[in-house]
Amino acid sequence: NVDTVRENIKKQYPNLKISNIQKTEMPGLYSANLDQQIIYLGEDGQHMFVGSMIRLKDQKNLTKDLVLGQNSIDWKQLPLKDAIKTVKGNGQHVLAVFSDPNCPYCKQLEPELDKLKDVTIYTFIYPLKPQSIVVSRQVWCAPNQSYSWKKLIEQGVKPTVASCTNPIDRNLELGKKLGFNGTPTLIFANGFKLVGARSAEEIQAVWKELGL
């Protein structure tokens, strides 16, 4: 059972950070999470493999369901009014991004987002770094939020000092509530979540795979 697998792993490999152990449809095989990746384990804790489990009778990818289930949030939890909205083309694809202006991976992501077509991007400014808080508020209070954000994160150009009522504290509370411990965090329209910088091709592949 699940407890047996957990104890065997803990006893033999105490430094292995495995979580969310579950039974699968295949007797003696268990799914789990390791570094945000779905893995499979034998009950004795001696074997582990990574890959897709396919149910042959209907060709259903059971691993895909696990990935979605364990890496998703409810899109309706996102207060879109607290994000900077950028629309490109017809805006049919939708993406939310939690981003810190001083995060190097967020800076890597921005040029990739620029390559996307027909997309609506909601940028939640999420200053995990203390030095990012003031400038995050200034971006929100700028006359053109989207332009100011791009200038800051891509070129390091800080906006003119401004103050106004802003959602930065709410964004921090929301991110912590949702368990967002790193940036950038990307959320797709069905709630599927990815952490870290991704290429435009990777984002487009997710849209295609999930029918978004």
Regions found by a protein language model. Name each.
Residues I38, F192-K193:
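Short, solvent-exposed loop/turn motifs
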Residues P143-K150:
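Conserved, helical-rich catalytic subdomain that frames metal- and/or nucleotide-binding sites
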